[in-house]
Curated annotation (Swiss-Prot):
Annotated family: Belongs to the HFCD (homooligomeric flavin containing Cys decarboxylase) superfamily.
GO molecular function, one term: phosphopantothenoylcysteine decarboxylase activity
Catalytic site: 174 (proton donor)
Stated name of the protein: Putative phosphopantothenoylcysteine decarboxylase
Subunit-structure text: Homotrimer.
Species for this entry: Dictyostelium discoideum
Enzyme Commission code(s) on record: 4.1.1.36
Pfam family, one: Flavoprotein
Gene Ontology CC annotations of this record: phosphopantothenoylcysteine decarboxylase complex
Sites where the protein binds FMN: 52, 102-105
PANTHER family linked: HOMO-OLIGOMERIC FLAVIN CONTAINING CYS DECARBOXYLASE FAMILY (PTHR14359), PHOSPHOPANTOTHENOYLCYSTEINE DECARBOXYLASE (PTHR14359:SF6)
């Protein structure tokens, strides 16, 4: 399988938006609304992220851009053409934005694990020529955990094309007040525009 971009405006750059299992995924519709003004967009939600998307939001997103889920990786394997979806996605994209990036996904990708479509794409990413932008979102204690610091430092050490959009302090979904909320959507979009490879 090779990804076609016939439905896209080819003067725009190609961006993949990864959604992960954080409650901040409820902002995905707003993020997509703003990103599609600037980029050709493909969305890759993890299975856990889908629990935070309403049916209406999923329908809206799928009406604006292509969505690839974990099952698509295996349904589209073409051994004769020696094609894999995560490789086709990497070849298509100029950049990837993972927003929100959960503690779980952050830990996986910083340790090279690749057990779903999104993390397989990250494992095969071209860090020399393409940017990867992460917008973490998690509980304050998870954000302040020493493992989180190590994971972020590991990713930053891979390439100057890896960017972290630090979370902000506010009242979190769990009721705690502290650092860990995903940055505001307009700031994430602006950062992505300015740091796209």
């Amino acid at each position: 399988m090779t990804i076609t971009i016939n439905n896209y405006n080819n003067d725009k750059k190609n961006l993949i938006l990864g959604l992960t299992g954080s409650v901040a995924t409820i902002k995905a519709k707003l993020l997509v609304e703003q990103l599609i003004q600037h980029f050709n967009l493909i969305v890759i939600p993890t299975e856990t992220s889908l629990k935070f998307l309403s049916d209406q939001d999923f329908e809206f997103i799928s009406s604006k851009c292509k969505i690839y889920k974990d099952k698509d990786e295996w349904e589209n394997v073409d051994l004769l053409k020696r094609s894999a979806l995560h490789i086709d996605l990497r070849n298509w994209a100029n950049s990837i934005l993972i927003s929100p990036c959960s503690a779980n996904t952050l830990g996986k990708i910083s340790n090279g694990l690749c057990d779903n479509l999104l993390t397989s794409l990250i494992r095969a990413w071209d860090y020399k020529n393409k940017s990867m932008i992460l917008a973490p979102a998690m509980n304050t204690m998870m954000w302040e955990n020493p493992f989180t610091f190590k994971h972020i430092e590991t990713l930053k050490s891979i390439s100057p094309n890896v960017f972290i959009i630090d979370p902000i302090e506010k009242k979190l979904f769990c009721g705690d007040i502290g650092m860990g909320a995903m940055e505001q959507v307009p700031k994430i979009v602006d950062f992505t525009i300015n740091n796209l490879k």
